[in-house]
Regions:
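Acidic, metal/ion-coordinating pockets
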Residues: 1-170, 214, 219-229, 237-240, ...
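Extracellular/luminal Pro/Thr/Ser-rich low-complexity repeat and linker "mucin-like" segments
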Residues: 44, 89, 184, 188, ...
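Short connector loops/turns at beta-strand edges and beta->alpha or beta->beta junctions
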Residues: 50-55, 366-369, 443
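Catalytic centers of hydrolytic enzymes
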Residues: 57-63, 79, 141-419
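Single, functionally critical "micro-switch" positions that shape active/binding sites
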Residues: 122, 283, 441
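Extracytoplasmic Gram-positive cell-surface binding/anchoring modules and repeats
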Residues: 420-465
Length: 465
């Protein structure tokens, strides 16, 4: 959060640049730009730009008082004017190139403000030496997967070339840094390296496609089951019947896979590294439906807010258009739904979903405070934090409920979230359930948005189904 950021800033012995994040007094909390002059006299101007998505990608409760300027064009043009005497101007952006981040991507920045010579980008973890249409945008991925190189000609004072160099196991490392890192690794291994369980199945840690940000996963099922189980151990504190208690966590918070074999505490903390605590919020069925609609607005494209669930069965009509409000949610880059077009809640704990009923949603404190697309949760007037972290809940669930073994029940997603890509198939129609079930079982596929056919020659069993 902001408090931690301020503390870190006092320890930094280097420039941190960001032109579009302001404090309560309306002034940038960082230096906006900086000019570096090389030994050969080339003046390189840098300015920083943070994604406005940080308003909901970070826990909103931890960044109160900060304002994120969404007018990338105006901010960039101001910086270009300040750096107009420099030979080369480079934007250091944390914007990314994902479609779900529009209109705040590095493409949007480059196209909006003329005069940027190069963009060094982050946020989407993309690996690219140039943009899709040749834009001078470079991104090195994540976790030091690559080193980006830019070559500037001293004579012309222009960028001559740029490239990426992949870091491999045999790449030479700085000895002092490697030694310092190893001390930290050894300390973590000592504290969290003990085996506490085994897994008979691999739990999906991918983002997309076919990952935690664009569909149901067995990892999401396990985590939300654990969250729900943990709260139900002390259900006396709940104000609704247990058949009205569900769990939701954002797929973007699931960061790694669990392999077959021994499972350590370190493995679980790698899957859930943020230290989020479990909160319980009370919402109406209408508010729950809004949260699901908003958090799947771009699916089948990936989105960090994708709702992994327990106790809920829902269908996403991916062929339907998201009916967005004209204005974004407060302090957000996301648009809430004007109407519900894409999501249908099929059941809650096997029973009929009722829009006017009150439901207890077990979620993480990030979503409860309105992180990602969950403004409907932030608006809840009744909520409480259990103080239990997600990783501890998962470890307790595996140890006590699963008896230390993640078994075949988690070999595959359990069919809680269904996809309906057909524009002319409504969940409420007499044939809707049958078509959607056949599609999600892999028996049929769409040949267009309105027609379908078997994927292969059908067996009698498949045909009769």
């Amino acid at each position: 959060g902001y408090a931690q950021l301020k503390e870190n800033m006092t320890k930094a012995d280097f420039k941190v640049l960001c032109a579009n994040v302001y404090g309560e007094d309306g002034t940038p909390i960082f230096d906006a730009n900086y000019t570096y002059t090389t030994k050969s006299g080339v003046k390189i101007g840098f300015f920083g730009m943070e994604t406005p998505e940080a308003q909901t990608k970070a826990n909103p409760a931890l960044i109160k008082g900060l304002k994120f300027d969404t007018d990338l064009k105006a901010v960039a043009e101001k910086q270009l004017e300040a750096l107009k005497d420099d030979d080369v101007v480079i934007a250091l952006s944390h914007l990314g190139v994902d479609d779900s981040s529009k209109p705040y991507t590095s493409y949007d920045l480059y196209n909006a403000a003329k005069g940027i010579d190069f963009i060094i980008d982050g946020h989407s973890h993309s690996v690219m030496a140039k943009g899709k249409n040749g834009e001078p945008i470079q991104s090195t991925g994540t976790k030091f997967a690559n080193i980006g190189v830019i070559v500037i000609d001293n004579a012309t004072k222009k960028i001559e070339s740029n490239s990426l160099y992949e870091i491999k196991e045999d790449t030479a490392k700085d000895a002092a840094v490697a030694a310092a890192a190893q001390k930290i690794i050894d300390r973590i291994d000592k504290e969290y390296g003990a085996v506490f369980a085994k897994s008979k199945v691999e739990l999906n840690g991918a983002k997309a496609p076919n990952g935690n940000r664009d569909g149901e996963t067995n990892n999401g099922d396990l985590i939300t089951d654990a969250m729900l189980w943990k709260v139900m151990q002390n259900k006396e504190g709940l104000t609704v019947n247990e058949d009205h208690v569900v769990a939701i966590t954002n797929g973007g918070g699931i960061r790694a896979a669990i392999k077959v074999g021994d499972v350590t505490k370190k493995d679980i903390k790698t899957v859930l590294p943020f230290g989020n605590t479990i909160e319980v919020i009370y919402v109406t069925g209408t508010e729950l439906l809004e949260a699901l609609e908003a958090s799947t607005f771009c699916v089948p494209e990936s989105i960090g807010g994708f709702p992994q669930v327990s106790g809920i069965s829902y269908t996403i009509s991916t062929g339907a258009v998201y009916d967005a409000n004209a204005e974004t949610y407060p302090a957000s880059t996301y648009y809430g739904p004007k109407s519900i077009n894409r999501v249908t809640i099929n059941s809650i704990n096997g029973k009929e979903f009722k829009a006017n009923d009150t439901y207890a949603v077990v979620t993480n404190n990030f979503c409860a405070e309105g992180g990602d697309t969950y403004y409907a949760f932030a608006a809840a007037t009744s909520k409480f934090d259990t103080g239990v972290t997600l990783d501890m809940a998962v470890m307790d669930y595996i140890t006590k409920e699963l008896k230390g073994v993640i078994g075949e029940q988690y070999a595959a997603p359990q069919g809680r979230i269904l996809m309906n890509p057909f524009k002319d198939v409504k969940v409420s129609s007499w044939f809707g359930k049958y078509v959607i079930d056949l599609y999600n079982d892999g028996i049929i596929n769409g040949t267009s948005a309105t027609t379908y056919a078997p994927n292969d020659t059908l067996t009698w069993a498949a045909a009769l189904k």
